[in-house]
């Protein structure tokens, strides 16, 4: 082994040992960081854990004053390790059942509208009719089979057959997946028209309703869908995502809403609207009224009509879908956008001013009162704490602005127990305190205080911003652990230590083949039959199989490792030093 390789291995071993130490301090380190930061800015510290999640900011003063006050309201609001005596799971189920009850009332109201004697439509009814026409023009009468197949895929999450640890698509290709009775015809059609091995484990109308952690006040309810249902749901979601671009709505790009939130905070002409429990409030009746019959039938075929709760009880859904369904995000974006555009049209406003990203809605400020009325009629609840139509503050898609100034806070979400946890918090503090490119001296003292809790090697190991949080953000030029190879500089970062997972070879090859088919074919899946593959297509598929590689699956061990990454080119003069007739480059001198 060369001296260079030996040196690198020695440094890696030192850094690895440092990364696997524990941060030992008395009390709650996360709360200590938050309180010291507040004191540095002249704010009163938190007196209790309850205050951390209940403090409300004042929407006045200068941008700098508001930025600090807003940070106090947000920094610990999503922390998940407070001991408040709240049964967060029970709170989540209470909200879940309340949303179902509201959807039932909405279904009854929308299916039996109460027209007046002169048959004048209310604002809500008028918007439904206008939105229906807009949606039909945008998405057509029925979803395209070719379009759906182009977007069909397995996600990386859990299904009713596979738990999260076996969520990778290769496991889903290897194992039979469940489907609902109405989705069975889609699976059988796919089996008859493709070369993939399509197997069904169970035919059941149920999905699995579960909770996942959210914060110290409540959990979040989601639904785990049958595998084949999710496969086709994502196909429908992909079609809707493509069609929404015709309205200037790109669900792959949050920066559109972020830029417009900035504009609204300056001009006050645009409002940001947020909804409470948006995905759990889309009733069946609303979808039937808004969507073309062909589309509504397909959505009904692919949804799970019932859910099984952890206690074994069963709920028959009054909503079209929930968080966890493969088309929920795109469908809610379509519905909110169509209603908002209809409101703007009724008020003689430019409907192209409406942009949507899920339940983050931006539209002209003067349309907000009417939109609230329409949303109330169709069963949605406006989140008044996160809806802003007046004043200098706007928030959308994770960016927050006050009079045009970026006041986006950072969050401490989890307990700090490892150097990696502390590095993440310190990096977020760095980004928040250097928003204008220069360290705020008030925050810098707090940063230096808590950086000392890291092992010395990790204090000196720095990487440029934008390369993740595997090391402290800083100048790579002063990193003593950086290595140069040619013109590339490599720096060590902390990564999760993983081990290869045992996997089914069949599923691995099928997943790789499927991915290649999607990337190399205009039609998505390789089909067969009278209108499917000919001999040339079959030869192409055989070639894909020959080039396929087993998918590598790994799992985290709970420990940390060190990996060198290329972070930048070396900064050297692009010329040499003349020595007579010879030129010696500076990096060789």
UniProtKB/Swiss-Prot annotation:
Changing residue 164 to A: 80% loss of RNA polymerase activity. InterPro entries: DNA/RNA_pol_sf, RNA-dir_Rpol_cat_phage, RNArep_beta. Changing residue 345 to A: Almost complete loss of infectivity. Signal peptide: none annotated. Changing residue 549 to A: 25% loss of RNA polymerase activity. Changing residue 511 to A: 50% loss of RNA polymerase activity. Binds 2 Mg(2+) per subunit, Ca(2+) is used in crystallization to prevent RNA polymerase activity. Its cofactor is Mg(2+). Pfam families: RNA_replicase_B. Its EC number is 2.7.7.48. GO terms for biological process: viral RNA genome replication. This is the catalytic subunit of the viral RNA-dependent RNA polymerase complex. This complex is involved in viral RNA replication that produces (+)-stranded genomes via a complementary, (-)-stranded intermediate. Binds RNA cooperatively with the host ribosomal protein S1. This is RNA-directed RNA polymerase subunit beta. It comes from Escherichia virus Qbeta.
């Amino acid at each position: 082994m060369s001296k260079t390789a030996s040196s690198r291995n020695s440094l890696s071993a030192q850094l690895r040992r440092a990364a696997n130490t524990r941060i030992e301090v008395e009390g709650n380190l996360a709360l200590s960081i938050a309180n010291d930061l507040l004191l540095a800015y002249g704010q009163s510290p938190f007196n209790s854990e309850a205050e951390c999640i209940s403090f409300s900011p004042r929407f006045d003063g200068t941008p700098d004053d508001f930025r600090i006050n807003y940070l106090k309201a947000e920094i610990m609001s999503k922390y998940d390790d407070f001991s408040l005596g709240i049964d967060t799971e029970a709170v989540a189920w209470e909200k879940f059942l309340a949303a179902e009850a509201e959807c039932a009332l909405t279904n009854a109201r929308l299916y039996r509208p109460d027209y007046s004697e002169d048959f004048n439509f209310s604002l809500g009814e008028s918007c439904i009719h206008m939105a229906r026409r807009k949606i039909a023009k945008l998405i057509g009468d029925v979803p395209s089979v070719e379009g759906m197949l182009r977007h069909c895929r397995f996600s990386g999450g859990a299904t009713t057959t596979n738990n999260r640890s076996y969520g990778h698509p290769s496991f889903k290709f290897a194992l039979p997946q469940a489907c609902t009775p109405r989705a069975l015809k889609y699976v059988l059609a796919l089996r008859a028209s493709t070369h993939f091995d399509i197997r069904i484990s169970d035919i059941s109308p149920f999905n699995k309703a579960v909770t996942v952690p959210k914060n110290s006040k409540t959990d979040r309810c989601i639904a785990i869908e049958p595998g084949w249902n999710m496969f086709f749901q994502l196909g429908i979601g992909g079609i809707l995502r493509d069609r929404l671009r015709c309205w200037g709505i790109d669900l792959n790009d949050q920066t559109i809403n972020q830029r417009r939130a900035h504009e609204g905070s300056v001009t006050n002409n645009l409002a940001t609207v947020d909804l409470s429990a948006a995905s759990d409030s889309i009733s069946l009746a609303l979808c039937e009224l808004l969507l073309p019959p062909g589309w509504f039938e397909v959505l009904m075929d692919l949804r799970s009509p019932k859910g099984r709760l952890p206690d074994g009880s069963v709920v028959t859904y009054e909503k079209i879908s929930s968080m966890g369904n493969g088309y929920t995000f795109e469908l809610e974006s379509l519905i909110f956008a169509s209603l908002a555009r209809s409101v703007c049209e009724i008020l003689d406003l430019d409907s192209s001013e409406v942009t949507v990203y899920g339940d983050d809605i931006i539209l002209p400020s003067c349309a907000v009162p009417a939109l609230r009325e329409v949303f109330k009629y169709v069963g949605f609840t406006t989140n008044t704490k996160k809806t802003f139509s007046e004043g200098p503050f706007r928030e959308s898609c994770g960016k927050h602005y006050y009079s045009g100034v970026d006041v986006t806070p950072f969050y401490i979400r989890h307990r700090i127990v490892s150097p990696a946890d502390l590095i993440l918090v310190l990096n977020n503090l760095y980004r928040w305190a250097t928003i204008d490119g220069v360290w705020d001296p008030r925050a810098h003292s707090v940063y230096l205080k808590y950086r000392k809790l890291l092992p010395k090697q990790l204090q000196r190991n720095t990487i440029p911003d934008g390369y993740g949080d595997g090391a402290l953000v800083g100048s790579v030029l002063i990193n003593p652990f950086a290595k140069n190879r040619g013109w590339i500089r490599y720096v060590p970062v902390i990564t999760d230590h993983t081990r290869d997972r045992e996997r089914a070879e069949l599923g691995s090859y099928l997943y790789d083949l499927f991915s290649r088919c999607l990337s190399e074919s205009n039609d998505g899946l390789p089909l067969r039959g009278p209108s499917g593959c000919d001999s040339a297509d079959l030869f192409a598929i055989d070639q894909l199989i020959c080039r396929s590689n087993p998918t590598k699956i790994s799992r985290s061990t709970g420990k940390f490792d060190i990996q060198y990454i290329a972070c930048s080119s070396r900064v050297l003069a692009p010329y040499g030093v003349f020595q007579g007739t010879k030129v010696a480059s500076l990096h060789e001198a």
